[in-house]
Every structure is written in structure tokens, then in C-alpha cells.
Amino acid sequence: MHAPAPVMDAGATIEHVASGRDAVLCLHGLTSTPYELRPVADALARRGLHVLAPRLLGHGSRPECLAHTRWTDWMASARLAFDRLADRHERVYIVGLSMGALLGVVLAHERGARCGGLVLMGTPLRLDTRTQLVLRLARRLPFIDAWPLVEKSDGPDVSDPGVAASMPSYDRVPLAAAASLIDGQEAALERLSRLRTPTLVLHGRNDHVAPVDNARRVISALRMPEKQLIIYPRSWHILPLDVESESVVRDTVAFIDAVRARGPCVPTDDPRRSITPAACAQETSP
């Protein structure tokens, strides 16, 4: 019998238990952990919400553990966590960062009215050109499962080197697992136009993982009226831990508060977008 894989000290599941009608599910990115969403999770918990940020399968331990997982496994982890919250609460809101945003889109579409609102951070419908090309080519490699772990050229995409160094995340990535992220990109893109969930799209202008054009692509694909976009001019990919973290947390909490209160939607000049007064979201710096 194999010993259980060790869990990174700061990378464990985060949960703040509360009663009430609503709960929030926070989903982290590929090779990362719930740690990157802690500022958001803690702030939402202070609003009296039950908040769960699960450690997705294969994460928060050793890169070798991730090698045995794929998009379908991370999706299964997200479904399990959502349904656990939905068993205890009427509505579940989803906050997803990076791969977690892709998971959130699919989950919100699948669970329909049980999902009260969706916050998408750094949504990687397409990665940077080089990485996207490498992953597409990797999918065609024979025996990709036996391919060795690939060293990351850079650490977590956050502007403060000190923050990046303190983040619990893998410094190597299994190529087959990373390549399966394309399945998530395709699944999310297919469902965006069919979503009926109020959605807030947040993105850093200097995102090196998922270029900022992803945010506008998401907004353009969404067809429901209640959608909002905020671009943070100084931030990179890991929004909740970057230099505009306070704004990211404030905007996320304000959006969820507004949707929970079912505030009216006020149309903007752009027919594809609307903003709720309480959130005051716009496609500018916060």
C-alpha cells in the first residue's frame, strides 16, 4: 500500500462553514492550489457565506501526482465540491481563476439555476502563443503519458517576486496533464454562449499566461444581459495576490452581493454588456 502523497502546507483546501441560503465555490488554476484564492475566500466568508476552495485532484502535493490526472478529473473534483455545497444551500456562486475559470463556465452551464453567479478571473480560452502551440502539438505525441515532467520557465505569473516565491505551486508540469487543458478550453468556449448565469469577467492587462484579449473574447461570447468586465491595468495573471488585490476582492464581493440582492441591470452603450449599480464594474481600471 502506497503512503498518501504529502500536501503542501499552505496549499490545502480552504473552507469557511456557514448556514444560510448561499455558498461560494472557489476553483484554483492548473499546478496551483486554493492558496491563490485565499483573499477572496476570506472576504466572502466575512459576508457570512459558506465558502469552499477545494484542492483539485493531483494538486498541492507532488508534480508526479498531477501526471495521473486530466481535465475530466479536475472537472469531477469541481462537480463534487459544487454538489456538496448545493446539498446544503439554495444557491452556489462560483469564483474561478485560470483553469478554475474554465471549470466554472462548464459547471455553471451544467448546474443551471443552482448557480447564482459566476466570477471568471484570467480565463485562458487561449494561452500565450508559444504555450498554446506546444500543448496542441503535445496532444499528437505518441506515448505522451510517458513524457517526463517539464520545468516551468517562470514561476507564478504575479508581478511581485516575493509573492510568487511564497506561493505553493508546482515548478514542473506533466506535459500530458497540461495538454488536456485544451479539452477545458474547448468545453468552456462551447458553453459560453449558452450560459444564463450573471457573470463578472476580471483580467489583468499584463497577464502573461492568458493574454488580456481573452477577457474581451469571453464578454463577446456571453449572450446574457447581466455581464460585466473589469481590466486591472497593473496586474498579471494571479489577480487575488497581485498589486490590485484589494480591488479584485472588493469587486468580486460587490458583484456577488449585487446578484444576491437581485439588483436591476442597467444597460450600457454596448448592447452586449450591462452593469449592476452595486458593482459599478466597467472596462477600465478600477
Predicted features along the sequence, with ranges:
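Conserved alpha/beta-hydrolase
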Residues: 41, 45-65
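Catalytic active-site module of serine/aspartate enzymes centered on a nucleophile-bearing elbow/loop
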Residues: 233-286
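Catalytic histidine neighborhood in serine/cysteine hydrolases
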Residues: 216, 220-238
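Short beta-strand/loop motif that positions the catalytic acidic residue
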Residues: 195, 201-203, 207
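Gly/Ala-rich beta-loop-alpha elbow adjacent to hydrolase catalytic centers
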Residues: 96-100, 104
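The serine-hydrolase catalytic nucleophile loop
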Residues: 31-41
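Conserved alpha/beta-hydrolase "acid-adjacent" motif
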Residues: 208-214
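Active-site nucleophile loop of the alpha/beta-hydrolase fold
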Residues: 119-129
